[in-house]
UniProtKB/Swiss-Prot annotation:
GO terms for molecular function: S-adenosylmethionine:tRNA ribosyltransferase-isomerase activity. It comes from Burkholderia orbicola (strain MC0-3). Its EC number is 2.4.99.17. One of its GO terms (biological process) is tRNA wobble guanine modification. Pathway: tRNA modification; tRNA-queuosine biosynthesis. PANTHER family: S-ADENOSYLMETHIONINE:TRNA RIBOSYLTRANSFERASE-ISOMERASE. Signal peptide: none annotated. Belongs to the QueA family. This is S-adenosylmethionine:tRNA ribosyltransferase-isomerase. It is found in: Cytoplasm. Keywords: Cytoplasm, Queuosine biosynthesis, S-adenosyl-L-methionine, Transferase. Monomer.
């Protein structure tokens, strides 16, 4: 049984990338194959990704777009507040986190960005329902601020508004970027197309819960946050075709991985094949999980003790990930959202009994 301490490591703070590199594909890429022992580690640059995958493989991208979900404002009393939109729930409604000296009650009016008023509705722990006076996606885009992760120490600027989005982002709804996708630019996508690599998209709107720390030593007691995803029939068909020709399904990012595996696990439990799915998922992937769809994973380097570090450890093997992270720190890779990437190959045998 793994505990929270098993996923801790010491990271020099200067390795936390604070800004994006000027060129998306200039990031480094650590290729990790845990299917052999000891694990094979190869230092590359992200522009070399096409040489690591084969014609007929399928890359699965998350096309969610980050909302300008952060607001500063005030109560009618003048008290200052900070609001982070968690998800849009309707044309004029959203769930949000509110930081204030005292939690606002239902019916309270809040002034956001000195531009418009919202009304607080019912509490949906730990969030508040907000009612907007106009379509909330429009007001969020016009007046909000990009919500950079807490470990990035500068306020979002015009560069972040471009670089903290993937080039293929098209469905607004996330409050954090699917960061593995930040390394792809249009020329790289076109090169992959030209060599016969297939592409498909799904949508998973990344919530603020992605930064939620695990507070229990027994990780089985952790309650995972829930996120909405849409896995279309076109992707299901491409997965089937990829399997038929012997290709690999490669998830671009842990969000793509979670959507694919959530849909596949649900299908498994219902005794049916993978099908188009729109649903909430709180899937928590830890060592012992049996992967059903994904063969390889493009991902960034994750925080100590995080659920995402547990996910990649489940996928590639705990000792493989430990070795890869030690190597990355020794070689001064850049970590977290604006950092470098890994290309992982699935470990064939789960390390403990699991789902």
């Amino acid at each position: 049984m793994f505990t929270l301490s098993d996923f801790d490591f010491n990271l020099p703070p200067e390795l936390i990338a604070q800004t994006a590199l000027p060129d998306r594909t200039a990031s480094r890429l650590l290729e990790v194959d845990g299917s052999v022992a000891p694990a094979r580690l190869v230092d590359r640059h992200f522009a070399e990704l096409p040489s690591c995958i084969a014609p007929g493989d399928l890359l699965v991208f998350n096309d969610t777009k980050v909302l300008k979900a952060r607001f500063f404002g005030q109560k009618a009393s003048g008290g200052k507040i900070e609001v982070l939109i968690e998800r849009v729930t309707g044309t004029h409604t959203a769930l949000a986190q509110i930081r204030a000296s005292k939690s606002p009650g239902a019916g309270t009016t809040l002034r956001l960005a000195d531009a418009f008023d919202v009304t607080v509705g019912e509490r949906v722990e730990p969030f508040f329902t907000l009612h907007f006076p106009a379509p909330c996606l429009d007001l969020i885009e016009q007046h909000g601020r990009l919500p950079l992760p807490p470990y990035i120490e500068h306020d979002a600027d015009a560069t972040d508004e471009t670089r903290y989005q993937t080039v293929y982002a098209s469905n607004p709804g996330a409050v954090a970027a699917p960061t593995a996708g930040l390394h792809f630019d249009q020329p790289l996508l076109e090169k992959l197309d030209a060599m016969g690599v297939e592409r498909a998209t799904l949508t998973l709107h990344v919530g603020a819960g992605t930064f939620q720390p695990v507070r229990v030593e027994n990780i089985a007691e952790h309650k995972m946050h829930s996120e909405w995803y849409d896995l279309p029939q076109s992707l299901v068909d491409k997965i089937a075709a990829t399997r038929a020709r012997g290709g690999n399904v490669i998830a671009v990012g842990t969000t793509s991985m979670r959507a694919l595996e959530a849909a596949a696990r649900s299908a498994d439990e219902a005794g049916r094949p993978l099908a188009a799915t729109q649903a909430e998922t709180d899937i928590f992937i830890t060592p012992g999980y049996r992967f059903r769809v994904v063969d390889r994973l493009v991902t960034n380097f994750h925080l100590p003790k995080s659920t995402l570090l547990m996910l990649v450890s489940a996928f590639a093997g705990v000792e493989t990930i430990r070795a890869a992270y030690r190597h990355a720190i020794e070689e001064r890779y850049r970590f977290f959202s604006y950092g470098d990437a890994m290309l992982l190959t699935r470990r064939d045998t789960p390390e403990a009994p699991g789902a």
